[in-house]
Swiss-Prot record:
Top-rank lineage group of the source organism: Bacteria
Listed GO MF terms: glutamate-1-semialdehyde 2,1-aminomutase activity; pyridoxal phosphate binding; transaminase activity
Recorded family membership: Belongs to the class-III pyridoxal-phosphate-dependent aminotransferase family. HemL subfamily.
Major localisation: cytoplasm
Residues found modified as N6-(pyridoxal phosphate)lysine: K272
Name used for this protein in its record: Glutamate-1-semialdehyde 2,1-aminomutase 1
Gene designation per UniProt: hemL1
Native source organism of the sequence: Exiguobacterium sibiricum (strain DSM 17290 / CCUG 55495 / CIP 109462 / JCM 13490 / 255-15)
Subunit structure: Homodimer.
Reactions this protein catalyses: (S)-4-amino-5-oxopentanoate = 5-aminolevulinate
NCBIfam families per the UniProt record, alphabetical: hemL (TIGR00713), PRK00062.1 (NF000818), PRK12389.1 (NF009055)
InterPro entries according to UniProt: 4pyrrol_synth_GluAld_NH2Trfase, Aminotrans_3, PyrdxlP-dep_Trfase, PyrdxlP-dep_Trfase_major, PyrdxlP-dep_Trfase_small
EC number: 5.4.3.8
């Protein structure tokens, strides 16, 4: 595999970007601050499982835009759908057929979505589910799990996980103390802690926000019985269970994590994959709850771009690809091969790691403990990950520049890509 140590055009673009874009990036996670700094790689184009940067280097991509690009870059079925929709106009400001078609397709895949509403992002979707839960229950408090990131609305930037934690600031300036008092945090996979919180505050809690499978301090699965107990305890106190499936929906199975785990929340927030690479969010749930949303009810939510034809067309096309036979079985097969190859490389070179993997998503932690909560992820060696990230990048393997993030496989990755990646891991571990 060729080396990619020289990236003069990326360095030049980063210098220019810092003069006109805050921090030189349009999302903090895109900077390399958490991995030792320097200019991020500027990409020219994506094709299948690969990126090509502005200096002509090719990378095997496991970032997948932090999850949405599950079918690989520039899949022709999706780009054709976007092109066809765009020819008829980019934005109407009126209802149209595609939003109905897509809503039906989501409902067929995720039965808990008795009614659906589209938004422009996962952040908007989560933000609105909380508003609706408050309207439905008449309560104000929200419970979330430490380290789980639910977007950048003020309320959710409390113990917020991968985004702020990557930069070493677990909360955000500008979030008021009054807002912070509306959120109660508790460790993921610790049901007794949650039980105690609800015993004390339950009559004031509107909802609990849950990643059914965590994706924002790495891939962390719930302990047996954890989600079932959350449902039971929450409903005993008259509060609602909201699943944030912005990362998990259509990642591990056709549908959502709730189908995989055989459990049902009251409401669900969606994003990322369902847009096929375009901006999107959606939320839905029980009909009696969703009827509190305007124009039927008092909980207001709107969006000029919400349900736009291009995003609807891209989402439908993406799901058409994912519902084909064997997609998730192949994710699991390649994911298992990648996991085993990394573990064998670590053993060969005496590097201490653990891996959490589910199907085609995994996280490599530089620690000797099994990570089941945010504190475990936090204890993983940041400096070691930063060195590993740079060594992989220099060999043409693109990972997320944060120890908290996952590696995502796409339908475009091949066995050859996995073999090349394992070879790069061996060379990187030999230098750690």
């Amino acid at each position: 595999m060729s080396t990619h140590t020289k990236r003069p055009t990326s360095e030049s673009l980063y210098e220019v970007a810092q003069k006109c874009i805050v921090g030189g990036v349009n999302s903090p996670s895109r900077s390399y601050k958490a991995v030792g700094g320097g200019a991020p790689v500027y990409m020219e184009r994506g094709e299948g499982a690969y990126f090509y940067d502005v200096d002509g280097n090719r990378y095997i991509d496991y970032l997948a835009a932090y999850g949405p690009i599950i079918t690989g870059h520039g899949h022709p079925h999706i780009t054709e759908a976007i092109t066809n929709a765009s020819r008829n106009g980019l934005l109407y400001g009126t209802p149209h057929r595609l939003e109905i078609d897509f809503a039906h397709k989501l409902q067929q895949a995720i039965p808990s979505l008795e009614k659906v509403r589209f938004t422009n992002s996962g952040t908007e979707a989560v933000m609105t589910t909380i508003r609706v839960a408050r309207a439905y229950t008449g309560r104000e408090l929200v419970v979330k799990f430490s380290g789980c990131y639910h977007g950048h609305s003020d309320l959710m930037l409390i113990a917020a996980g991968s985004g702020p934690a990557t930069l070493g600031s677990p909360d955000s300036a500008g979030v008021t103390k009054a807002t912070a008092k509306e959120v109660i945090t508790t460790p993921f996979n610790d049901i007794e802690s949650y039980r105690q919180i609800m015993a004390e505050w339950g009559d004031q809690v509107a909802c609990v926000l849950v990643e059914p499978i965590v994706g924002n301090f790495g891939i962390v699965e719930p302990q047996p019985g954890f989600l079932e107990a959350i449902n039971e305890i929450t409903h005993e106190h008259g509060a609602l269970v909201i699943y944030d499936e912005v990362i998990t929906a259509f990642r591990f199975t056709y549908g959502s994590a709730q189908e995989l785990l055989n459990i049902r929340p009251d409401m669900t927030a969606l994003g990322k994959i369902i847009g096929g690479g375009l901006p999107i969010g959606a939320y839905g749930g029980r009909q009696d709850i969703m009827e509190h949303v305007a124009p039927l009810g008092p909980a207001y939510q709107a969006g000029t771009m919400a349900g736009n034809p291009a995003s609807m067309a891209a989402g439908i096309a993406c799901l058409e690809l994912l519902e084909q036979p064997g997609v998730y079985e192949e994710f699991d097969r390649l994911g298992a091969k990648l996991e085993q190859g990394i573990l064998e490389a670590a053993d060969t070179h005496g590097v201490t790691i653990t891996i959490n993997r589910l199907k085609g998503a995994l996280t490599v932690y530089f620690t000797d403990e099994t990570v089941v909560d945010y504190l475990g992820a936090e204890r993983a060696d940041s400096e070691m990950f930063g060195r590993f990230f740079k060594l992989m990048l220099e060999q043409g393997v693109n990972l997320a520049p944060s120890k908290y993030e996952a590696w995502f496989l796409t339908t475009a990755h091949t066995e050859t890509d996995i073999d090349e990646t394992i070879a790069a891991v061996n060379r990187a571990f030999a230098q750690l």
